[in-house]
UniProtKB/Swiss-Prot annotation:
PANTHER family: 2-METHOXY-6-POLYPRENYL-1,4-BENZOQUINOL METHYLASE, MITOCHONDRIAL, METHYLTRANSFERASE. Keywords: Menaquinone biosynthesis, Methyltransferase, S-adenosyl-L-methionine, Transferase, Ubiquinone biosynthesis. The keyword Methyltransferase applies. The keyword Glycoprotein does not apply. Pathway: Quinol/quinone metabolism; menaquinone biosynthesis; menaquinol from 1,4-dihydroxy-2-naphthoate: step 2/2; Cofactor biosynthesis; ubiquinone biosynthesis. Gene3D superfamilies: Vaccinia Virus protein VP39. This is Ubiquinone/menaquinone biosynthesis C-methyltransferase UbiE. Methyltransferase required for the conversion of demethylmenaquinol (DMKH2) to menaquinol (MKH2) and the conversion of 2-polyprenyl-6-methoxy-1,4-benzoquinol (DDMQH2) to 2-polyprenyl-3-methyl-6-methoxy-1,4-benzoquinol (DMQH2). GO terms for biological process: aerobic respiration; menaquinone biosynthetic process; methylation. The gene is ubiE. SUPFAM superfamilies: S-adenosyl-L-methionine-dependent methyltransferases.
Length: 252
């Protein structure tokens, strides 16, 4: 390896290779992506996502970025919440941009039905195809750990947010108790790849996804990275005793 390295599961690879490797994983799992999250979280991810949407509280007229938005699971929540608020008190339509590096994920999302507020775009979280200070909110769910250069993606999030804009990142994290960590490790490394092989015929992709969670920074370290990227009011909320965490901040 002659250039900068990046993590790909438990492997260290050339940073230039990681985007293609990650793209391959999501090419294979795109049609079963929501099933994948059900397996990774035992179905609890749906409650976590509802909590994120409630925290975001989308409003009429807002521009919301759903980065690494995949199949649009979160974007649809945001669009419908903003629409309900609009029905109550009027205002302009919200705009929700789903931006994902993987075209297969975008295609899977589009196939799930039309929502007038949602726009679909293939794009890189490290180089978003958007102008400065264009968004009221930036959300990334279960995606930041797959980015090659996480600090670059955080700086890019700061760039596209308006002053005071909201940053929300939902990601798998570290359980806060040792017994839960041991139980989660057992489930992750023994059960999830086996289910992935039986249900999707793809052990390798699910093994990568489990490993990528373990290589991701813990709650405090990732909160520090968000602050270093130029956000204020940085904090996090643990979900299910730290199996996942919602990280938040405000653009300065």
């Amino acid at each position: 390896m002659t250039g900068p390295s990046a993590t790909f599961g438990f492997r260290d690879v050339d940073a230039r290779e990681k985007p293609g490797l990650v793209r391959g994983v999501f090419d294979r799992v795109a049609r079963r992506y929501d099933l994948m999250n059900d397996l990774m979280s035992a179905g609890v991810h749906r409650l976590w996502k509802d909590a994120v949407a409630a925290r975001l509280n989308p409003q009429p007229g807002e521009t919301i970025l759903d980065v690494a938005g995949g199949t649009g699971d979160m974007a649809r929540r945001f669009a419908r919440m903003a629409r309900r608020a609009q029905e109550r008190r009027g205002g302009d339509d919200a705009k929700v941009f789903v931006i994902d590096y993987n075209a297969e994920m975008i295609a899977a999302g589009r196939e799930r039905g039309f929502e007038p507020e949602i726009c679909w775009t293939v794009g890189d979280a490290q180089r978003l195809p958007l102008p400065d200070a264009c968004a009221d909110a930036y959300v990334i769910s279960f995606g930041i750990r797959n980015v090659t250069d996480i600090p670059a993606a955080l700086r890019e999030a700061r760039r596209v947010l308006k002053p005071g804009g909201r940053f929300l990142c939902l990601e798998f994290s570290r359980p806060v108790t040792e017994p839960l960590q041991r139980a989660y490790d057992l489930y992750s490394f023994k059960v999830i790849p086996e289910i992935g092989e039986r249900v999707a015929g793809d052990r390798e992709s699910y093994q990568y996804l489990v490993e990528s969670i373990r290589r991701f920074p813990d709650q405090k370290r990732f909160a520090g990275m968000i602050g270093e990227a130029g956000f204020s009011r940085v904090g996090y909320t643990n979900f299910t005793a730290g199996v996942a965490a919602l990280h938040t901040g405000r653009a300065i």
